[in-house]
């Protein structure tokens, strides 16, 4: 796919339609949740059918929404007191215009491949912007929107709120409630800190001397990884849930059931020893658990770590894997989040012990896995005035074992799972992916 870049510019916030002066520079201190999350760029791809909205309309909407979401027009830096912060300096978001002399249906892959990276701005070198966008127009009139944002500034929940507001601003509609930012008094340890969980070995780890095993993208593993798209129909999911929940008063959730099935499927395809242990890392949103508003803009996520032996996963029924996931997620409740705050902010651990965040990127997760579930995020509500996107998916991210769960664009309750696997495990994965056994 040959992509021709036409222009690149910074889009700055437009206050009150561009007639009001910009406010003074402000600083949003990074919260402890921002500091322990992944230091990575989160990249997603949208596709809109013709007639696609004009670039001028999209840019105008972007300038308007950045006035409300200033963090996405700022930069990562330091506050005057030397603390890590998002600097609200209105530098702007990078907007790239590009074109492809071909029809989208002939060029766009149905699953993430290296070619998808051409639908994003170049991410090489030191990035100055928090948000980078590329609008790529195809010969047929379709539009691809490549969106990239710094994960340290906002998690998936916050980013999806921004995207919906961007669409509304482009259509001239109210953007909704403004974002609520972190401040020094928002997350604090309790007067009498009470650490109830082993945060040293969950959110943190103690690096060994000279430990460089937590790198990403420098080991050549990506050449042997393919991202497989598994489509689970509503009927298939219903069958899985019925099988997993048999004899249980309250059925397992759609997420618990699909993840349990994929955990077992990946484990079987990998051909692991029965005595080997497998752990899943999955995000748990803390907004409700800590009583934070839904509009909180930043990171407010910790992780659950379901763990089981390969033998148990493969010889015991689906119900077992679903129960392990359910119990571990339930454990990460409000008390768990408060225990983490006490540990991380009271001086009980963290930097003083030489600990580092365990949320680090790897090329290969085997025998473990990680899941990003976007099943409840309103990504499909991004509408620039010509309707919802025809599809939405994560961009190319070749980390073996990193799963993404996304609602299908069909809108019928089906789910798409994007599963990076080794080439030599792909056929084994396909063989058991749609089996109820």
UniProtKB/Swiss-Prot annotation:
Ranges that cross the membrane: none
Alphabetical keyword list: Acyltransferase, Transferase
Annotated catalytic residues: 151, 383
InterPro entries per record: CAT-like_dom_sf (IPR023213), Plant_Fungal_Acyltransferase (IPR050317)
UniProt GO MF annotations: acyltransferase activity, transferring groups other than amino-acyl groups; hydroxycinnamoyltransferase activity
Any coiled-coil regions, as ranges: none
The organism's place on the tree of life at top rank: Eukaryota
Enzyme class: transferase
Tissues in which the UniProt entry reports expression: Highly expressed in roots. Expressed at low levels in shoots and flowers.
Its EC number(s): 2.3.1.-
The family this protein is said to belong to: Belongs to the plant acyltransferase family.
Physiological role: Hydroxycinnamoyl transferase that catalyzes the transfer of an acyl from p-coumaryol-CoA to putrescine, to produce coumaroyl putrescine. Can use feruloyl-CoA and caffeoyl-CoA as acyl donors.
The name this protein goes by in its record: Putrescine hydroxycinnamoyltransferase 3
